[in-house]
């Protein structure tokens, strides 16, 4: 079979895996209130808002997912070199990473909540721990598995020269950064502040004054993930999937059109710059259109 067709198929699969990975990663962080929105959850009891959110801020998402995917990639790489089937090796590595993820989540939740119990009266709800840890580990496993699969395809079918553990680390950092900057805005700036007028941002005076009641009953992290699965999660997945797909596409296009290594590299760089320029123009047009249509925010 034509090597170019194999590369295109692998790239399509890697892009699809990255899309699923980004969505699962963002929804996992919504269940556990990690990264940007976590500072608001952490401030809630200090503002008198006793909540039932899962508060786990182990670290920023780029660092934590860099760790999880690197663990999965390292174990998978070792098992593959030992002769195990690649898919099984990735599953085993992702399972170990999920256990690490769960251990950090439990210790972070108990540590942060207990630290606020005496001074601010925030109880440790054990049912929140038991009901949220499953979705956290489950979404985390899906995210880590698909990221490790994309990293494996990059190192085998797409010609990435770096070893699987390093590529997995980079992919984990990347998807964590995208989830933190793209999907978490839907949770931290909207879901947690639905009692305030939409579009006003989060003034300093309102920080920590989070919503603690849902449409029915008291709100928790599972409600947040359900809400964000409609927009924030898919948007994160689309962003990460496009990054993986377009980055691989420019390299394949350089291999198709170019002859020697310098020509291939130059074409790939030019295509990458063109993609960035087109994305910047589209973003600008979209922002101007939205501002002209809806106007400035007024309280």
From Swiss-Prot:
Q: How does it assemble?
A: The complex is composed of 8 subunits; MtrA, MtrB, MtrC, MtrD, MtrE, MtrF, MtrG and MtrH.
**Main function:** Part of a complex that catalyzes the formation of methyl-coenzyme M and tetrahydromethanopterin from coenzyme M and methyl-tetrahydromethanopterin. This is an energy-conserving, sodium-ion translocating step.
The protein's name is Tetrahydromethanopterin S-methyltransferase subunit E
Protein species of origin:
Methanococcus maripaludis (strain C7 / ATCC BAA-1331)
| Reactions catalysed according to its record | 5-methyl-5,6,7,8-tetrahydromethanopterin + coenzyme M + 2 Na(+)(in) = 5,6,7,8-tetrahydromethanopterin + methyl-coenzyme M + 2 Na(+)(out)
Ordered alphabetically, the record's keywords are: Cell membrane, Membrane, Methanogenesis, Methyltransferase, One-carbon metabolism, Transferase, Translocase, Transmembrane, Transmembrane helix
Membrane-crossing segments per the record:
57-77, 80-100, 133-153, 158-178, 226-246, 262-282
A molecular function GO annotation: tetrahydromethanopterin S-methyltransferase activity
| Annotated GO CC locations | cytoplasm; plasma membrane; vesicle membrane
* Broadest EC class assigned to this enzyme: translocase
Q: How does it sit in the membrane?
A: Multi-pass membrane protein
Where primarily located?
Answer: membrane
Pathway note: One-carbon metabolism; methanogenesis from CO(2); methyl-coenzyme M from 5,10-methylene-5,6,7,8-tetrahydromethanopterin: step 2/2
Q: Which domain of life is it from?
A: Archaea
HAMAP family reported in the protein's UniProt record: MtrE (MF_01098)
Q: Can you tell me which family this protein belongs to?
A: Belongs to the MtrE family.
Where is this protein localized, as stated in its record? Cell membrane
Q: What is its EC number?
A: 7.2.1.4
Q: Which InterPro entries match?
A: MeTrfase_E (IPR005780)
Any single biological process term in GO: one-carbon metabolic process
């Amino acid at each position: 079979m034509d090597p170019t067709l194999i590369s295109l198929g692998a790239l399509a699969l890697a892009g699809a895996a990255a899309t699923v990975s980004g969505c699962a990663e963002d929804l996992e962080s919504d269940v556990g209130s990690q990264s940007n929105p976590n500072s608001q959850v952490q401030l809630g009891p200090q503002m008198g808002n006793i909540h039932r959110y899962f508060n786990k801020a182990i670290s920023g998402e780029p660092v934590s997912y860099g760790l999880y995917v690197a663990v999965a990639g390292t174990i998978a790489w070792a098992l593959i070199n030992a002769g195990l089937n690649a898919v099984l090796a990735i599953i085993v590595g992702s399972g170990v990473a999920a256990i690490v993820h769960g251990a950090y989540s439990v210790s972070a939740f108990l540590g942060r909540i207990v630290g606020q119990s005496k001074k601010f009266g925030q109880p440790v709800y054990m049912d929140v721990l038991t009901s949220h840890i499953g979705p956290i580990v489950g979404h985390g496993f899906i995210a880590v598995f698909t990221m490790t699969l994309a990293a494996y395809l990059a190192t085998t079918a797409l010609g990435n020269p770096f070893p699987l553990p390093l590529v997995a680390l980079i992919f984990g950092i990347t998807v964590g950064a995208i989830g933190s900057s793209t999907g978490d805005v839907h949770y931290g700036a909207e879901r947690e502040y639905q009692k305030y007028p939409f579009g006003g941002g989060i003034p300093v005076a309102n920080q920590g004054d989070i919503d603690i009641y849902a449409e029915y009953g008291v709100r928790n992290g599972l409600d947040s993930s359900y809400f964000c699965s409609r927009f924030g999660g898919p948007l994160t997945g689309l962003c990460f999937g496009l990054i993986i797909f377009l980055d691989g596409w420019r390299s394949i296009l350089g291999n198709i059109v170019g002859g020697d290594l310098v020509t291939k590299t130059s074409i790939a760089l030019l295509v990458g710059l063109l993609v960035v320029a087109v994305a910047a123009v589209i973003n600008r047009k979209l922002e101007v259109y939205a501002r002209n249509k809806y106007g400035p925010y007024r309280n």
